[in-house]
Amino acid sequence: MAVAQTVEDFLAKHGIDYTLVSHPHTGSSHETAEAAHVNEDHIAKAVIVKDTGGYAMVVVPAGNWVEIEHLRKELRRDFHLATENQLAELFSDCEAGAVPPLGPAYGLETFLDRALSSLANVYFEAGDHEKLIHTSGEDFRTLLGGVRHGYYSHDN
C-alpha cells in the first residue's frame, strides 16, 4: 500500500515536503521504531478516543501511553478507547492499526502531546505497516495547527 490518499492529499494541500522511510512489516509502534531505526520518541502515534460527542485523536510519542483518566479530567469528557471496528470505519484508506496522526485530515478533534512540540524531526504512520512519513517538526506542527496542546501521556 502507498501513502493513504487522505494523508497524501492533506500533505499536498499544506505544501509539506516529506520523505518515506520503508521498513519491514511491523505490528506495533515499538517494532516500527526498531525496524525503521528511529527513536520511538520521534514517532508520533495516534490514539483514537470516543465519547458522546464523537471521536477525537490524541497524538503522543510512540513509546508513551495515553493518560486516559487525565484526559477525562482535564477536558471534562468521558472518553474511552475506540474499537478496532470503529477505527476501520474512520480510517478506511488505511490498513488496520496503521492510523496516521493527522486528525484534521480526517475531520477529528485532535489533542497533541507537548512531548512532540519541540522535535526537529517527526515520523508517523503513512497508512500501512511498512512505511513512515518523515517531515520536519515545524511542518508537522503546521499540519496540526490549531489543535489543543497538553500533557496527555506518560512513558511506557
Give the label of every model feature segment.
Residues M1-N156:
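Extended, low-hydrophobicity, polar/charged segments
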